[in-house]
């Protein structure tokens, strides 16, 4: 991508909380995107005191791998639940800036609005890059939900403090749901459709599988 995302990062929880609260006011929760022809999976792994971010761009809807990038950054922010984007986003932004093909949509291995301050990494990255983004997480961070029916594509709302903050989505019968939430510029039901369009034989969408394999093992599954 012909773009740099350099910016100051917080040095305290108070600064980080203020940044999240500011970003929250800029999140667009309705569909505000053009045609989606490329979709990128985003994931981050750890090695010692550094974060290794991987971004894999796939054609949509064919899911052919078109481009990928990795970036390593030293972690300068402590591990605190709810603030992981400050550990991971700097490396992810470096990887995004290295891409030759700009994605039309980000699907992040993490949460968006389904977050204590409604600003998980999917929303954080979406607002900073102004790219449409979706959170698709393997585990729950906040909220409660009824079990979705054991049918591919079935989902139930994820509630937290009186709000619908996401969805528990059954991507395949007989497997645990994933947790989909708005990141930026994509409505919830649209986000669910995009995630399901990226699911093939596995519980996780191909975007997540590709980025996770690249971050963890240095290769993309075929």
Swiss-Prot record:
Its EC number is 3.1.21.7. It comes from the Bacteria. Keywords: Cytoplasm, DNA damage, DNA repair, Endonuclease, Hydrolase, Magnesium, Metal-binding, Nuclease. It holds the Pfam family Endonuclease_5. CDD domains: Endonuclease_V (cd06559). It is an enzyme of class 3 (hydrolase). The keyword Disulfide bond does not apply. InterPro entries: Endonuclease-V. It is found in: Cytoplasm. Gene3D superfamilies: archaeoglobus fulgidus dsm 4304 superfamily. The keyword Translocase does not apply. PANTHER family: ENDONUCLEASE V. NCBIfam families: PRK11617.1 (NF008629). DNA repair enzyme involved in the repair of deaminated bases. Selectively cleaves double-stranded DNA at the second phosphodiester bond 3' to a deoxyinosine leaving behind the intact lesion on the nicked DNA. This is Endonuclease V. It comes from Roseiflexus sp. (strain RS-1). The gene is nfi.
